[in-house]
Amino acid sequence: MMMILSFKERLKQFYSNFEFYLKPLFKILCTFIAFCVINHKIGYMTMLTQPTVVGVASIMCGVLPCSLIVVILSLIIVGHLYALNMELAIIALILFVLMYLLYFKFTPKDGFVLFMVPIAFALNIPYVVPILVGLALTPVSIVSVAFGVLVEKMMDYVSNNAVTINSVSSDSILKRMNILLNGMFTDKTFYITMIVFAVVIIVVYILRTRSVDHAWMVAIIVGAICNVAGFIGAEVVLSINTDIETSSLVIQTVIAALIAAVFNICVFSVDYSRTEHLQFEDDEYVYYVKAVPKINIAAPEVSVKRINTRRMKNVTKKKEPARPQAGKRKRVSRED
């Protein structure tokens, strides 16, 4: 525990010293991962999958705000879908425009959550998203997570049904779009995932805002239990085939809870053993306050002392007194 807190303080100090360089570097890394995930799943436009294009685009996104990065990633998805099927690209473009006009225009800071969901699914840790969102954000971010799940399921559907999508033949564009929409939105796993994630976010947010000891850890544990119970309940009680193995569900949820626990230690580390209950009042109210001190550990300072060996030899070496040479004596003259 103390080692983690000490590492946190060192990390904070390092970040404050090099924030100017680390912020764009973090954006470049996240954008590069997002590009790789998109190209791996729906890389139908060869030009956009070139390493040079991916690298240059990632570096450019390092100096752009998050809202513009989300727009660029959305256009990349639309470009890949256009190379596969024009109607599918139109559907994706309409969905993205609705997302921005209805939500991300007013809450641009939540835009990064939209593409964190597909990245988490690609890394096989999807259930860490609702727990971390419940810890760090508010229930309003449920909309961002829902859009992220929509983008993930859309790319997953296109990746698994590319041959079927190309074989769709109809005289009317609207009929072809209707066929594609029915194929995308008839997957019940999509709706179950959005509902379970929304419930987990609300539960985690409510519990971590309570004034009880270890509220964040309780929120993480209960949120993980709700996540497992939600997917298993949908499959057992509602008889909905979610195509999720119980073993992988439990393992991935445990990993998500561990990641959230580390996040808790790094962000919200308090000492409940020194909790104080205070009471004071003014002319209108009586206040009952629970004060929990934070755990602050100063990062150990490493001092390097340089020792000059030559100087040390000169200091330690003592000069020996000169001895009179043998056979020579001083003559002393005496005057009577």
Regions found by a protein language model. Give the residues of each.
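Short, Lys/Arg-rich, polar N-terminal cytosolic tail immediately upstream
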Residues: 1-18
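Alpha-helical transmembrane segments of multi-pass integral membrane proteins
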Residues: 11, 18-24, 33-40, 50, ...
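C-terminal ends of transmembrane helices
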Residues: 12, 60, 98-106, 203-210
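Hydrophobic transmembrane alpha-helices
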Residues: 20-74, 80-81
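Structural signature of hydrophobic alpha-helical transmembrane segments
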Residues: 38-52, 80-94, 187-195
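Membrane-interface helix-loop-helix junctions at boundaries between adjacent transmembrane segments
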Residues: 59, 72-146
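Generic multipass alpha-helical transmembrane bundles of integral membrane proteins
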Residues: 120-121, 129-241, 253
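Short, highly charged, low-complexity non-transmembrane loops/tails of multi-pass membrane proteins
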Residues: 270-327
